[in-house]
Amino acid sequence: MARKKQSGGRKVEGWKAKNWYKVHAPEFLGKQFIGEIISSNPENVPGRVLTVSLGELIQDYSKQNVRASFKIMNVAGDAAYTQFNGHEMTKEFVRAMVKKRASRVDSTITVTPLGSTRELQVTITAFTINHARLSQVQELRAKMVKVVEDSAKEADFESFVSAMLKGELSKKMFAECKPIFPVRRIEIIKSESVSSAADRAAALIR
């Protein structure tokens, strides 16, 4: 019994030695409070990733099936500030979008938003109403990719991510693709911040 009490005491002391840090979303999302993490050393906080419901973050119920992740970049006092790290629609939601006698058109590309040193790998998916022929699938894919690449050339990183998360890019792709073939929905189902070519080259030199 004495050993158990001592063990419990050490655990309490260990928890007391740790601090809670309030994690905030990036500035383009209003620096909203998105959660808390605990650490005994503030130097160990940067680099950690927090994943939250996008629907709750931007107050849009239609985005409840989307999870967004944010990477902590720096700490000031008990506040931890993040940058966008990526997002993903739940696999269950994506599967539910696939209907019989219809086509699913996917494309994964990497874009570098205007003036940014950060790259984003995005997966675009179109769900058609009817089965599409190969030529129609290819045309849909090319149009989706063009819309996203053109948008990245015209918007900085924060503006591009905001348009992606809020569905503005999806609406633009839908409008452009609808004349090609009847589509039911087009979404960027996943994105991930990846190292730029310059960063990869610098890492090799080091």
Swiss-Prot record:
Pfam families reported for this sequence: Ribosomal_S3Ae (PF01015)
InterPro entries assigned: Ribosomal_eS1, Ribosomal_eS1_arc
Any one of the GO BP annotations: translation
Top-rank lineage group of the source organism: Archaea
Keywords (A to Z) from UniProt: Ribonucleoprotein, Ribosomal protein
The keyword Ribonucleoprotein is annotated on this UniProt entry: yes
GO cellular component: ribonucleoprotein complex; ribosome
Protein's UniProt keywords contain Ribonucleoprotein: yes
Gene Ontology MF terms: structural constituent of ribosome
SMART domains: Ribosomal_S3Ae (SM01397)
Stated family: Belongs to the eukaryotic ribosomal protein eS1 family.
Name of protein: Small ribosomal subunit protein eS1
Lineage summary: Archaea, Methanobacteriati, Methanobacteriota, Stenosarchaea group, Methanomicrobia
